[in-house]
């Protein structure tokens, strides 16, 4: 194991003919850890689970008033033990529900190869290739997320309106006990990934060791950990069980609103519709997702494993949870405005990504906004010493800003929050978090590209100077 670490650590740089130092295989997470990164990692490991618990507890015990628990503790009206005593414990019912859920998603992922791509025009499913890894490999993936999502939701509606095997409110009725189950899976997966990377990695050349336990545990060591040929940890845990569950969780919230108040408010419908568009878009473009930063940059550790099991399903669905406890009926004008903001944001997000995908598929032999797109050609060297070429487009939305897809994503995120009105801060956490996440991702992605492409990246940033907001940032 020590020899593998030394071998990996020596792969950083290589001399080329002109004597300059050329970065080799330098994308992916860091080889070394600075103090700020280490402090951030330790902070997240210590407090991220508490943040999730605090948000969910605030709704369960304080009607989603974020400051109320702190004020009660400060004033002496409540003690930590009082809050904890009111928190639902882990139950066997929740364990059985969660085990059934995860097992069902594993079954759909592993044992039902995609057939939708055979008769749904425009959909790219089945066996697809990912991007080249730092070690120079191109992995193949079984893309069947849209099929899994469709089957899951057809069964959910069949149960809700015909079979009645379980209540449509089953998720929210067991929401906090399910939180403990999700944490158990998240930590188990992250720990297994750490052990696997050290003792039986899928590809040792795509492992990165820093020598710091906390950083390696959180950010991951293996680039693409797998069990067997097809069970890819990244693809499974990012899409299933988290994102497939996203829309089911929202449907459970809507069912609870109907049960409690006798109606589903237009704000709940808006949240369900706008977030469902995002989820379906994700699975429709799952093969495109194989070329994004999560697959092409991140190693698999606690950040992805626990985050996909806990952070995503619990904090990305806060708007629906808030509306269960605080139903909001928007005016027609406000509802239309929120809908338009969400749809325009989605259009920018989707068309920006579509332009990039079209440009890649055709190697630039296409038209963007009626013209042949302009680009800057770059080269990089993978860890196996091979030289590869890429083109960075500077036309269409990609000529307006380097990450305008993130701008559209943020517009959609804001729409989800605005549907909840302005009485509480809690539903706006998602927009605040996504802003921080995507700005950080901009910087992280550009650091990766700068390491990967060198001086060619500087030419690109000169041609497209803004990241998210033209004229501002």
From Swiss-Prot:
Catalytic activity, reaction form: cholesterol + NADP(+) = 7-dehydrocholesterol + NADPH + H(+); 7-dehydrodesmosterol + NADPH + H(+) = desmosterol + NADP(+)
InterPro entries linked to this entry: ERG24_DHCR-like, Sterol_reductase_CS
GO cellular component, one term: endoplasmic reticulum membrane
Cellular compartment(s): Endoplasmic reticulum membrane
A Pfam family it matches: ERG4_ERG24
Biological role: Catalyzes the last step of the cholesterol synthesis pathway, which transforms cholesta-5,7-dien-3beta-ol (7-dehydrocholesterol,7-DHC) into cholesterol by reducing the C7-C8 double bond of its sterol core. Can also metabolize cholesta-5,7,24-trien-3beta-ol (7-dehydrodemosterol, 7-DHD) to desmosterol, which is then metabolized by the Delta(24)-sterol reductase (DHCR24) to cholesterol.
The protein, known as: 7-dehydrocholesterol reductase
Source organism of this protein record: Xenopus laevis
Higher taxonomy: Eukaryota, Metazoa, Chordata, Craniata, Vertebrata
């Amino acid at each position: 194991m020590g020899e593998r670490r030394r071998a990996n650590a020596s792969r950083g740089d290589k001399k080329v003919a002109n004597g300059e130092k050329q970065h080799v295989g330098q994308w992916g997470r860091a080889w070394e850890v600075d103090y700020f990164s280490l402090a951030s990692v330790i902070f997240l490991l210590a407090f991220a689970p508490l943040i999730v618990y605090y948000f969910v507890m605030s709704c369960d015990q304080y009607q989603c008033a974020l400051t109320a628990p702190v004020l009660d503790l400060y004033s002496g009206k409540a003690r930590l033990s009082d809050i904890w005593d009111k928190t639902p414990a882990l139950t066997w019912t929740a364990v059985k529900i969660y085990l059934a859920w995860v097992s069902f998603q594993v079954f759909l992922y592993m044992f039902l190869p995609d057939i939708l791509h055979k008769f749904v025009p425009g959909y790219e499913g089945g066996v697809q290739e990912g991007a080249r890894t730092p070690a120079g490999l191109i992995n193949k993936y079984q893309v069947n997320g849209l099929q899994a999502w469709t089957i899951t939701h057809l069964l959910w509606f069949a149960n809700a309106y015909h079979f009645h095997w379980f209540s449509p409110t089953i998720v929210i009725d067991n929401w906090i006990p399910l939180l403990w189950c999700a944490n158990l899976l998240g930590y188990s997966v992250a720990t297994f990934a750490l052990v696997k990377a050290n003792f039986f990695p899928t590809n040792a050349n795509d492992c990165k060791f820093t020598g710091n336990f906390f950083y390696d545990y959180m950010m991951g060591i293996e680039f693409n950990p797998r069990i067997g040929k097809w069970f890819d940890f990244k693809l499974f845990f990012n899409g299933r069980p988290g994102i497939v569950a996203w829309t089911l969780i929202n449907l459970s919230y809507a069912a609870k609103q109907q049960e409690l108040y006798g109606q589903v408010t237009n704000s709940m419908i808006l949240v369900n519709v706008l977030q469902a568009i995002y989820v379906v878009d994700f699975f429709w473009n799952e093969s495109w997702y194989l070329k994004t930063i999560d697959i092409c940059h991140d190693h698999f550790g606690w950040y992805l494993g626990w985050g996909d099991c806990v952070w995503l399903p619990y904090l990305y669905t806060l708007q629906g949870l808030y509306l269960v406890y605080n139903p909001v009926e928007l005016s027609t004008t406000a509802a239309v405005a929120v809908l338009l903001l969400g749809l325009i944001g989605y259009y920018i997000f989707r068309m920006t990504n579509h332009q990039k995908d079209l440009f890649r598929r055709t190697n630039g032999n296409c038209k963007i906004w009626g013209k042949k797109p302009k680009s800057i050609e770059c080269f990089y060297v993978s860890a196996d010493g091979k030289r590869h070429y890429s083109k960075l487009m500077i036309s269409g939305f990609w000529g307006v800003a380097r990450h305008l897809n993130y701008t559209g994503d943020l517009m959609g995120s804001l729409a989800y929050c605005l549907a909840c009105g302005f009485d509480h801060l809690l539903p706006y956490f998602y927009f605040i978090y996504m802003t921080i996440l995507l700005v950080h991702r901009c910087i992280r992605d550009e650091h990766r590209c700068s390491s990967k492409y060198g001086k060619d990246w500087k030419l690109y940033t000169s041609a497209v100077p803004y990241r998210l907001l033209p004229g501002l940032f």
